[in-house]
Each structure stands twice: as structure tokens, then as C-alpha cells.
Amino acid sequence: MKSISKMLCLVDGEHYLPVTQESIDVLNNLEHIDIVAAVFIGGTEKLRDDSEESYSKVLGVPVQFAKNEDIPYDIIVEMINRYDVDTVMDLSDEPILDYPKRFKIACKTLAQGVSYQGPDFKFDPVTQYEIMEKPSIKIIGTGKRIGKTAVSGFVSRLIDKNGYEPCVIAMGRGGPQEPEIVHGEQLEITPEFLLEQSEKGVHAASDHWEDALMSRILTIGCRRCGGGMAGEVFLTNMKKGAKLANQVDSKFAIFEGSGAAIPPIKTNKNIVLIGANQPLNNIIDYFGPYRIGLGDLIILTMCEEPMCNEEKREYIEKFIKEINPKAKIISTVFRPKPLADISGKKVLFATTAPKSIEHELVDYLETNYNCEIVGTTPHLSNRPLLKKDIEKYMDEADIMLTELKAAAVDVATKDSIKAGLDVVYCDNIPVPINYKYPDLSKSVLEIVDEAIEDFNKD
């Protein structure tokens, strides 16, 4: 038997009141629905009486009117909380609501843990299991290839170095069928070891292997398939992974999202990553504002030309402040950090970074690590092109320096070892673009302390 769903209806003055009344009655006659209130969101064409009292009397439920001509987003949120609403039903239409306005309503309602639906659509809040028995944070993003795993590695190392004893639970599209523990603090994770794992059928460039290699801490690998508009996944074993995280010898848990998908585990605090390289409408429209609203700390990545100019970065920062004024914002770039000495070596560098910033990365490596970059490839996620680039440069290089992404193991590592090259893996470090931003390490540790405080309150 279905439980009763408390419903808030959005109505307008573009419909005759008797038509709206009939729709309310149809919904109220459904056994599992209880219409608790309505919000009048605008329109005057067919409105004969703008009295809340008379309108409420006809509809048979309390009706709250907008105080001006704008869509009353704040009133919708207020009514959701006042009446403990489960679902917002949209009985409006063009011209009162267009697509952007409806997405904005969806972001507002989902942020309250409430569904938003209309005649042919429905958006539900993302699943959040309340199962953690230790303090935890989520690291989520607004898309793929924005540096989530790199930031997760940075955060994990920082937390571990400061004595918080963390573990990482990561979900990926190539993750294991059953949650897999990798003891990064115990294993010697060499290129040969990862290649051996890959040949056994393990996705050895999966995020939890990268986390284990880069951070040298315990990681738990999970899988996921599909990603909804608001971040829900179709399939994942991360709930099992979270239960495993409760049992392992760690005191703090870091849940790492995948692409724009959100881990289905309720955590104490959230770090949200936004790729400044993304199309602007992916950030400010659709469900971008919803994800931004989840952040306690927001890290804007890839803030350099040609991916993002100063004008775009400042616009994004301003938008974030409007959506989530309480969150701290830090704009960053990524810079490579080899995990072994490459001084004096001739290096072939494989990365997922776009070719447009190749010069900056090459200059950084040669200046800071005393090496000579003899070739680069931005094709770690394109196996055929990656193979061609390796063949092109392998006779000039001593070392393959590669991020642990995509085809880094089954192509870059395998082909390089076969050609007699040493393989060194490379981390990416987030660096604030200037001194005006808060200290990144300090800001992360503040979020960790707040998460611990929040956990201890419960």
C-alpha cells in the first residue's frame, strides 16, 4: 500500500479557476495524495480575483500568492517546509514557466529533498543512505574530466598527513562487481603490478587504484552505471562499499563521485568541483545550481586560458556566491607532479589535459623537475591515437610519464615497458591561481574538522 504523499501545487492565472479547481480535485481523489497547499506563481489573463482568501476557498487548500511579478522561488521553498511537503506538482505552463524557470524550481525542490513533477516529467531527490558510522565528506563535480580524482588524491594525502586516518570510497564506470579494498599504505604499486592486474581483467586505471597509488592510503573501489540529470545512478554497489568503510581501520571516510554522478551516501560535508573549462550553461543552468548548492567548499578547476578566461571565471564565481553564499570558493589550476625522480631524463608525457595547455605543462615540468620533454600526448582517453603517439616518440624518450587515467595501464604502461622505457606515474596538484584566494590546504582541513563536529553532534 502506498503511503500518503503531501503535495504542494503550483498554479497560475493563465488558467480559468474552475479548470485549476478540477485538476486539484482529480489529484485529491487519488488515495495516496493529499494536497496540502498551493502557490500562485503568476499570470493575470484569466484571473478575476487576486484575493488569497477567495482563491483558497475555491480550491479548498491554502494558497500563497507571489508578492511581485517574478516566480516566487523562495515562497515555494517556504511552503515546502511549512507543510512538510513530499512532492511539488506543477499545474502551470508557458508563458508563466519556461524551461530555465522549471529547472530552477527543480533545483530548489530537490535541495529540500522533495520531488518536482508535472504532466510529463518528474525529478526525484538523489538517494542518500544514512549508514555512516564515522565522519565523512563527499567530493562531487559538475562533469567529467574536471579533476575530481586529482583533488580527491590531494585531499586524501592532506588529511592523512595531518593524522585523520582516512579511507577513500570511489565509484567508477569500470569498478569491480564487489567492493574491492586496495591497501595503498601496504602495497608497492609499480607499473608492472598494475599491468599484471590489468591483464587479469582488473580496470587498473580505475579511480580507487589511482587514489591508492597517489595517496598511499586504503581505498575501496565500487562501480556505477548511468548518471541522471541531478546525479542519481542506475546501478552502484557503493552502499556495500560504505558498509565496508565502516568496518575498516580508518577514522574518516572520503566518498568520491564519478563524472557528475553523486555518491548515494549521506555525508557530513561536501566539496564540490566545478570545471571552468565546461560550457557555461552546464554550470549555471539545468542542475548545475543544485550541485553548487550542495557545496561547503567549492573548488573551481582549470582556471587558465584558453579553457577559461578571467571574465568567465569571475562570472562563475559571482554566480556561485549568489547560489551558495555560505560556501568558500577557491579558483585553481592543475600542475603535474611526478611520483619518482625524472631529473636529467628525456620524457614522453601522457595526459588527459587538452593540447591547448600543453606549453604550460611542459614548461612547468622542465622548470621544476629538470627534465626534457621530447613529446606529449593528450590522448590517454583515445587508445588508437595514444598508440600512435607512443610509437612516434618512443625512440627519443627514456621515460613515459603518465597520469593514471583511462588507457594509462593497458596501453601507455604496456607499450612503454615493451619498448624498454621506464614508466613513472604522475599526479596533478590543484594550485590556487593567486594569493587572493584562501589557503587550499587550510580550507580543506576546516571542512574535515566541521564534518567531525557535525558527526559528533549526531
UniProtKB/Swiss-Prot annotation:
Main location: cytoplasm
GO MF, any single term: ligase activity
Main EC class the enzyme belongs to: ligase
Catalysed transformations (reactions): (2R)-2,3-bisphosphoglycerate + ATP + H(+) = cyclic (2R)-2,3-bisphosphoglycerate + ADP + phosphate
Gene Ontology CC annotations of this record: cytoplasm
UniProt KW keywords: ATP-binding, Cytoplasm, Ligase, Nucleotide-binding
EC number: 6.5.1.9
Family that this chain belongs to: Belongs to the cyclic 2,3-diphosphoglycerate synthetase family.
Known role: Catalyzes the formation of cyclic 2,3-diphosphoglycerate (cDPG) by formation of an intramolecular phosphoanhydride bond at the expense of ATP.
Protein name: Cyclic 2,3-diphosphoglycerate synthetase
Organism ancestry: Archaea, Methanobacteriati, Methanobacteriota, Methanomada group, Methanobacteria
Gene coding for it: cpgS
